[in-house]
């Protein structure tokens, strides 16, 4: 049996993944997001993806800059190819937003991408789906079993209905959360058990950033030798609701090899009750520490993973980072204190202790 492999790319404060799947005699490549920068030194996404002659599925989980820029660049580079190298694209983009080509605005990039994808699709070169939500039919995919678990139909409909209005209001939202750095600093001195018991803020669909993340595509992929819960920047309540509806519970947990932690380890994109119905010891966190108003991961997120009620503390938790921990901590401060060692965890980056189904560049 061939070994499927999840490749975890350094993507600054964003996400970029390549999954090479095998299922029996079939194999295929899935690309998930593309990071925030077109500089190949800072974001190796373009160079790595160009090594793949044929991509079976490309997923842009949502249209924030830190997920879309590399994918947008790849599509622009190949849009005029006689044979477009991607079979399918899943992009829940706001294509109805009539805005000119611009720079450094996620919505403008998504609209420009939508125009391009429409032309490629109309020419019969690829299959573009712009309405991917929980329960989306993936039965014709032969190289892996893929189950889309978020967003819900209701959330995605709200996204399309409200997008233009919220985009217009985006400039009125605070550009900087001045309390974030102070909170991060205070959290360093709070024990993880206490942090894990904090109440989470609920997403506000009337805020642009929250709505975009609520519409993020989350899915489970299963192939030979690999299973992963890929959460994009989704919020936990919707993911948990879907899983419980499918019969998962504290007594019948979802078993996966890896969880790609949502939103780079942001504290409000995880919950104890979601973790309680997942059986997994390997957690992937994609971040270099964040940028601007973002400080990732939150120590509170690590606390949830290590201290939620349903955890079997006899099994070590493995955290996989795509940047050395000391680089991340230069921005967010110390994530683990000396007394945290008792919680039984192991830190990994590309230089130490990777399982054979995970690769970190």
Give the residues covered by each predicted segment:
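Conserved beta-strand hairpin/beta-sheet module of binuclear metal-dependent hydrolase folds
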Residues: 2-52, 211-237
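Active-site environment of divalent metal-dependent phosphoester hydrolases
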Residues: 13-15, 36-39, 63-69, 96-99, ...
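Long, well-ordered mid-to-C-terminal structural blocks that present hydrophobic/aromatic surfaces
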Residues: 219-274
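Active-site metal-binding motif and surrounding structural segment of the metallo-beta-lactamase
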Residues: 27-28, 40-89, 249-268, 277-284
